[in-house]
Amino acid sequence: PKNMTHATFRDLGFAARPDGTFDVYSAGGLGNNPRFGVLVAQAVAPEKILYYIKAMWLTFRAYGNYENRGKARTRYMQEVCGGPEGYAKAYQEKLAEVLASGEDLDIHPEAPVYEKQGDGVVVAGPRVLEQKQPGLYTVSWHPLGGQPAVETLCALSDAIAGMEAVEMRLAPDETAYIINLTGAEAQK
């Protein structure tokens, strides 16, 4: 799947799969000595995600560097554990502890039901994405510097306030996605 969230270079990244599950990457990061995350799990059900988050927390508590602030990053744990394979093994051990603990960390997310229909207006542009729902669009917005003025956010809020089922979602790279827009709404 397309790595839209850059899951492979995060402390803990989840890459969505077409079947509705996630691949989990751990101990990646940018900055000095950048590293891709290690694939630690495949096809994880959405309701089981918190087990993987807790395993990451326990792994960092066990192998993270608390002495040197410059190395207090998850990507350095790959070195500490002897490389990506050693890190994957250490992570799996912590995951096994979490799963064996009996703690119920299952979540039950409900998939939203969208009844909104397109209006027949077709739009295209570098920031316009077609949604899987026919006739609906997403507009991506990446504010320069990542910090829009309050007035800009208020204007955006005013613009979408009267639009049915329109939401704004934020991505880790500071991009905002305004979703569930009809063609006419996307043009605004």
Segments the model singles out, each with a brief description of its role:
Residues 1-188:
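Peripheral terminal and linker regions in Fe-S/redox and tRNA-modifying enzymes
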